[in-house]
Amino acid sequence: GKATTKKVEIPERDRYDNGYDNHGHDDFEHDQTEVDIQEVVRKEKESYDHNERDIYGNARNDFEHVQTEVDIQEVVRKEKESYDHNIGDRYGNIHDDFEHDQTEVDIQEVVRKEEESYDRNEGDRYGNGHDDFEHDQTEVDIQEVVRKEKESYAHKYRR
């Protein structure tokens, strides 16, 4: 079947500074990458010897724990649009055989820090006993959005 693309409207103010361009380009090359995120939520490594208590007062049996938690929801949309000579694009720009590659992803970041205190032999939520335990936890839920565009414009069009 024929490939279809969904037009994505991007406000002009988000693309150019204060009407700097106003739809007129002089052989304009534009490479844009918005948002480069690499986020690690929580990483911990705990080593326990046989029947020795860990830093939380828990008893383990030769336990090796490496934990990396990242909760990422990623939405990626790629579209490729070709414009023929003298055909205006969605922004009203005229292109000469224009190739447009767009990758969009949106980012919302929620960070929660919680501190938990445990008294001696008062089991925590995992059923572990702690001796005045202080726990700092940072959880990040990320929706990642990245936009990449490359645009070539001829210099003949003025608005």
From Swiss-Prot:
Q: In which tissues does this protein get expressed?
A: Component of the organic matrix of calcified shell layers.
Q: Where is this region: Disordered?
A: 1-33, 80-159
What is the name of this protein? Answer: Gigasin-1
Instruction: State the superkingdom.
Output: Eukaryota
Species classification:
Eukaryota, Metazoa, Spiralia, Lophotrochozoa, Mollusca
N-terminal signal peptide:
none
